[in-house]
Amino acid sequence: FILAAIMFLFIYMIVGKDFTPAVINEVQIESPAEKAGLKKNDIILEIDGTKVESVLDVSKLITMSTSEFIDFKVSRYEKDLFLKIKPNIIATEDNLGNKINKRVVGIVIGAFNDKVNHVKLDPLKALYYSVNEVYFVTSSTLSYLGSMIFGDADTSQLGGPIRIAKISGQVAQFGIIPFLSMMAYISISLGLINLFPIPLLDGGHLMFYGFE
């Protein structure tokens, strides 16, 4: 977890973090978003209770959601609206050519007022957002695992060492920053697995110590 936080800290200080508000540029006809009531020019404030601070957050939060319905909080003419959207699940490929089942709601996102707000953070703010990202990934992973146990999550998204190595090699071709980001996410996942109450893992040792 500490290693992941350090990686995010480095990225936010050196490269920066995006804070561009997300506005809906298009709502596709007959899409889940249109049926739920989303409209063009709605500003997305929250998804599943998590604040949307950047256009980049929208796709991430939709992808990480595991419940049947996704909760949207949007601003329309300075009024806050709360909508529940049941996403469609489509078989597709990610940017690296890996087959995935993707959750989509049928919206096209753009920058509010077409202004991009990408800033390099000072050490204190970078630390805050680094810890926040570690917390988000940890809680989302635990939520996903819980949904998988009860049969509500897509198990095709899981991958073993071979798949991780393959994806890591593909990501490395895009540069050091995307590679570091992926390593941070993997570090969090390994940290969680290490805490599971399984013999030979730290979680197993802690369980035995608790029994003693």
Model-identified regions with their sequence ranges:
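PDZ-domain C-terminal substructure recognizer with occasional recognition of PDZ-binding tails
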Residues: 10, 35, 39, 45-46, ...
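Internal alpha-helical transmembrane segments
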Residues: 1-26
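Residue-level signature of catalytic and energy-coupling elements of molecular machines
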Residues: 7, 58, 134, 198
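Short helix-capping/hinge motifs at transmembrane helix termini and TM-loop junctions
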Residues: 7, 11-16, 150-151, 173, ...
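Transmembrane alpha-helical segments of integral membrane proteins
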Residues: 200-212
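Functional transmembrane alpha-helices
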Residues: 91-192, 210-212
